[in-house]
UniProtKB/Swiss-Prot annotation:
Main location: secreted
Pfam family, one: RnaseA
Gene3D superfamilies the record matches: Ribonuclease A-like domain
GO cellular component, one term: extracellular region
Name of this protein: Ribonuclease pancreatic
Family as reported in the entry's similarity comment: Belongs to the pancreatic ribonuclease family.
InterPro entries, per database record: RNaseA, RNaseA-like_dom_sf, RNaseA_AS, RNaseA_domain
Organism ancestry: Eukaryota, Metazoa, Chordata, Craniata, Vertebrata
Gene giving rise to this polypeptide: RNASE1
Subunit structure of this chain's protein: Monomer. Interacts with and forms tight 1:1 complexes with RNH1. Dimerization of two such complexes may occur. Interaction with RNH1 inhibits this protein.
Alphabetical list of CDD domains matching this protein: RNase_A_canonical
Amino acid sequence: MGLEKSFILFSLLVLVLGWVQPSLSKESSADKFKRQHMDTEGSSNSSPTYCNQMMTRGDMTNGSCKPVNTFVHEPLADVQAICSQENVTCKNGKKNCYKSTSALHITDCRLKGNSKYPNCDYKTSDYQKHIIIACDGNPSVPVHFDATV
């Protein structure tokens, strides 16, 4: 009888762990935004290899080359504060986008025309521009980089 109970408990444990474990490893939209768009450590400093390094580090060249990406060189708190600034319509028509009230230091990375996976090669361009981000949650946090203006 004791062995039967142990087997049932073990089976339940395996079932629960199998159900919980995948949710523990799933990256949240907010964490993905930080990984793909935040570089608070500095800027490209006009280095032509900045985008190549950052796109690889941000896991955006795994399986294919992401065609366009923007990195923001401002404190995370400043970017999160945009979620309470001017509400604008997103490119996809949703109403959860917000425009920064001031221009931010950003680096734009664009895949060069002749570049093919696995040798993703990016053009690096620095700008001071307003950004538009999508925000979700309570408290509202950035989950998608929508545009620069």
